[in-house]
A protein has these predicted regions:
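NAD(P)+-binding Rossmann beta1-loop-alpha1 motif at the extreme N-terminus of oxidoreductases
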Residues: 1-53
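Structured loop/turn residues at beta-strand edges in well-structured enzyme cores
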Residues: 5, 69, 76, 126-129
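Amphipathic alpha-helical segments at domain termini/boundaries
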Residues: 10, 28, 61-83, 159-169, ...
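Short glycine/serine/threonine-rich phosphate/pyrophosphate-binding segments
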Residues: 19-21, 90-94, 116-118
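A structural alpha-helix within SAM-dependent methyltransferase catalytic domains
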Residues: 24-27, 75, 100, 122
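Structural/interface elements that position substrates and couple domains in central-metabolism enzymes
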Residues: 34, 50-52, 151, 170-173, ...
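Rossmann-like NAD(P)-binding element
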Residues: 38-41, 55-109
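Rossmann-fold dinucleotide-binding core
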Residues: 108-176, 180
Length: 189
């Protein structure tokens, strides 16, 4: 496992409304951000991107916004990758697996999920100590539950909490409260 470095390069996978809002929040906070979506029209939406670019220019931000046409391109040099795909087990497993294969070993995986066990998702990667889930609104500052599997690396957990703090959230780290269903299913077979 590569040593932890500061989380400065962020990949956002999913450029729907929430993904774009979160990406803009990251750039405003000074992060180098790459945004990717499976639907290129979301990235190239003239009105949406013009608004984002005008906002960024008007605020003279220190962060940078890059657009990627593939997940591989988006996560190539990411310190942290966060997805905004539907909160369904199959979708999350697919995107976690894809990012896990394509991103450098140091990359932290993060996902907003109100229902899925991060322990399950982490167990399907080669980096279970670097996987986290957030619960709460990512569009307005406030309290966020930062869920981690029992195997989480404390230094990485601290870095992820600091990242969300820089975005004006109040992360509350806690161990995954959800029963890992995938592991239960495997044990029962």
């Amino acid at each position: 496992m590569q040593p932890l470095r500061e989380l400065r390069r962020i990949a956002v996978i999913g450029a729907g409304t929430t993904g774009r809002d979160f990406a803009l929040r990251c750039v405003r906070a000074g992060f180098d951000l790459t945004l990717e979506d499976v639907m290129p029209s979301r990235l190239r939406s003239a009105a949406a991107m013009a608004t984002v670019q005008q906002t960024l220019a008007a605020e003279a931000l220190s962060g940078a916004l890059h657009l990627a046409s593939t997940v591989e391109e988006a996560v190539r040099d990411a310190d942290l990758a966060i997805d905004f795909v539907p909160d369904e087990l199959e979708s999350k497993l697919e995107i976690f697996s894809m990012i896990d294969r394509m991103a450098p070993p140091r990359t932290v995986l993060c996902t907003p999920s109100d229902a899925l066990s991060i322990t399950d998702l982490a167990s399907c990667t080669y980096r279970p100590t670097r996987c986290f889930a957030v619960r709460g609104s990512l569009t307005t500052p406030g309290s966020l539950r930062l869920l981690h599997p029992p195997t989480a690396d404390p230094a990485v957990l601290s870095a992820v909490a600091d990242f969300f703090t820089q975005l004006r959230f109040s992360p509350v780290p806690e161990s995954d409260p959800d029963a890992p269903m995938l592991m239960k299913n495997l044990v029962g077979k």
